[in-house]
Regions:
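Hydrophobic residues in well-ordered beta-strands that form the structural core
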Residues: 52, 92, 117-119, 148, ...
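C-terminal helix-rich "cap/oligomerization" subdomain common to oxidoreductases
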Residues: 66-68, 215, 282-324
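Contiguous beta-strand/loop segments that form the cofactor/metal-binding neighborhood of enzyme cores
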Residues: 180-253, 270, 282-289, 323
């Protein structure tokens, strides 16, 4: 059983803790927050053995094997390095870092130290991903030519979205999901990536649209928003029909339609704890096999997603303070 630690005690950490508590392959061992009382309350609520008032104390605990990083993505780079320097395997929330340079550095560092480091982009690990792959491969919609995907939440008032010093904006927080959806369906070998964004007064993107063009002529048309609520749908268009994915952020079902727009097949999502369990199980498997990356989200894919977002931000003139 892998002893897990969590860095950060916010909303996403609570979801992970509630998930870990229901799993047999890991144990809820330690949690750290910048405030000890908060960490202690978290530990009591979710059944963790240890609570720490600093991240440094948690990584110094030799019992901790795998650390889940649930801090704002502006801090992922330093927290990944902190964990790796203390010999911990790492599952880090998305966005993995703020740019490709940071990602490349910590991934190289993990390989050098012989430690697992992987990005917690949960959609990559879910079983419905294989279901979607199988449906497309069956040829039921013929040759796919285009996909659309969107993700929008009413989150513009949240600190992590508003503030440039926290690497805020819609792109890194929610735009990463449509981008990953496109990469999972059509691959990550793109010929061209372009985008348009509306920036806030503080200089981060409130909402955006992104277009990927592939060497074989396929296109992915994507958008994300922190100010508008979207239907979260992904649609893949073929020459014999189309596929609708209900909620690209946590698949709630897949529906297949023919050329007359008649429903021909549907697939339900299997019962899950929260959906977070799949990325944790992937880490447990990788650690058990002595692997340094998870096949569900290889390092090269994490680097490509960061590269895409770097290019989009370059087009928008969106630079974070820590990059200047």
């Amino acid at each position: 059983m892998i002893k897990t630690g969590i860095i950060g005690a916010g909303r996403i950490a609570k979801t992970m803790a509630a998930t870990l508590r229901e799993m047999d392959s890991v144990s809820c061992y330690a949690v750290a927050a910048r405030d000890y009382d908060r960490a202690e309350a978290f530990a009591k609520k979710y059944g963790f053995c240890k609570a720490y008032g600093s991240y440094e104390e948690l990584v110094q605990d030799e019992e901790v094997q795998l650390v889940y990083i649930a801090t704002p993505h502006s801090h992922h780079y330093e927290h990944i390095k902190l964990c790796l320097n203390h010999g911990k395997h790492v599952l880090c929330e998305k966005s993995f870092t703020i740019n490709e340079g940071q990602a490349a550095e910590v991934l190289a560092m993990a390989k050098e130290k012989g430690l697992l480091l992987t990005e917690a982009i949960w959609t990559r690990y879910m079983p419905m991903r294989k279901t979607l792959d199988d449906v497309i491969a069956s040829g039921i919609i013929g040759k796919p030519h285009m996909l659309t995907a969107n993700l929008g939440y009413l989150i513009s008032g949240k600190e992590r979205i508003m503030r440039p010093e926290l690497a805020g904006g819609a792109l890194l927080d929610v735009g990463i999901y449509p981008l990953n959806f496109a990469a999972m369906v059509f691959g990550s070998d793109v010929k061209e990536i372009t985008g348009t964004a509306v920036l806030t007064e503080l200089g981060v993107d409130a909402q955006n649209s992104m277009t990927l063009v592939y060497p074989d002529g396929k296109m992915a048309v994507l958008n994300s928003s922190s100010v508008g609520l979207s239907d979260r749908r992904g649609v893949i268009y073929g020459d014999k029909g189309y596929i609708e994915v209900e909620n690209i952020n946590n698949c709630e079902g897949i529906r297949v339609y023919d050329v007359n727009r008649n429903l021909t097949a549907s697939y339900e999502t299997p019962k899950q704890i929260s959906g977070y369990e799949y990325e944790v199980e992937a880490c447990v498997r990788a650690i058990g096999n002595g692997e340094l990356e998870c096949p569900e989200m290889p390092h090269e894919e994490t680097l490509k997603m960061m590269r895409w977002m770097d290019e989009l931000r370059r087009q928008w003139g969106m630079v974070f303070p820590m990059e200047e």
